[in-house]
Amino acid sequence: MSQRTRLSVNVNKIAVLRNSRGHGAPDVIRAASACIDAGAHGITVHPRPDARHIRHDDVIRLSALTRARGVEFNIEGNPFAEPRAGYCGLLALCRETRPHQVTLVPDGDQQITSDHGFDFAREGPGLRPLIDEIKQWGCRVSLFVDVNVTGLADAAIWGVDRIELYTGPYAEMHHAGCSDAVLREFATTARLAQDVGLGVNAGHDLSQTNLGVFLGAVPDVLEVSIGHALISEALYEGLIPTVRRYLDILDSVNPAVSMR
C-alpha cells in the first residue's frame, strides 16, 4: 500500500488567538473541521503544561472529531514534563484519547517553540519505557530529531515507528538562499532512518514557500505537520484555500511513497 505525503495541520495557533480573549472564538474544533473539509489528512496538537494554547478539553474534542471524520490525530509533547494544575501530563492525555500518533518532543516549559530533537545516547534510557507504554495503547510513536541525529538503529530497536525531522534549520537556510548543503544532510538522515525501518515525518517552519523544495530533495517523507505558517497564510488567503494550496504542493512534488 502507498500514499502521497500527508498533511497534518497543527491548530495550536487557533487556540492562541482564542485564549488571548478568554472566550470561545475562534473555535478550534470548527477550524480543525474546516481543515479536514479542505482535505487535510490529519490534525496535530502540542499541548503544553502552561496551557498557553491547546487545553485538555480541546484534546478530548479533537480526538472525537478526528475519529468521526476518519483522519489521523497526532499529539505532540514532552513526555518528561511533570503534571500540574490544568495539565495531566502528555502520557495521561494519550492514554485517555489513544491518538493515531504520539510525537515525543524534548521541549522545555519556557520554550516559545520546539527548537531541537532528542539526544538518543543521553535520553534513550528514559524514553524506552515510555515508548513501550504508548505502543501498548495502539499508538504509533514518532521521535522529534535533529538532522544528522545518531542512534537511529537504536530507536528502531526500541520500537519507534517514525522520526520527525526538525526542519527549522532548513527553513532558515532556504530563507537565506543557501539551502543546498543542509538539504543534502536532511536527505542523508532520511535515508539512514528508512534503512533501519523507520518512517520519516517532517515539521517546523515549513511553508508554501519552502515545502516543495524540501520534499523534492528529501526522499519518501510520509507526513508533514504544519501550523504557524499555514495559519499565518490563512489570515490573507482563507483557511480552506490555504490548506488546498498545501495539498496541491504535495501532489505536485512527490509521487506515492511507501507506508511505514
Swiss-Prot record:
3-amino-2-oxopropyl phosphate binds at residues 10, 21, 205, 227-228. Its EC number is 2.6.99.2. Catalyzes the complicated ring closure reaction between the two acyclic compounds 1-deoxy-D-xylulose-5-phosphate (DXP) and 3-amino-2-oxopropyl phosphate (1-amino-acetone-3-phosphate or AAP) to form pyridoxine 5'-phosphate (PNP) and inorganic phosphate. Homooctamer; tetramer of dimers. GO terms for molecular function: pyridoxine 5'-phosphate synthase activity. It catalyses: 3-amino-2-oxopropyl phosphate + 1-deoxy-D-xylulose 5-phosphate = pyridoxine 5'-phosphate + phosphate + 2 H2O + H(+). The active site is at 46 (proton acceptor), 76 (proton acceptor), 204 (proton donor). This is Pyridoxine 5'-phosphate synthase. One of its GO terms (cellular component) is cytosol. One of its GO terms (biological process) is pyridoxine biosynthetic process. It comes from the Bacteria. 1-deoxy-D-xylulose 5-phosphate binds at residues 48, 53, 113. InterPro entries: Aldolase_TIM (IPR013785), PyrdxlP_synth_PdxJ (IPR004569), Pyridoxine-5'_phos_synth (IPR036130). HAMAP family: PdxJ. It is found in: Cytoplasm. Belongs to the PNP synthase family. The record marks 164 as: Transition state stabilizer.
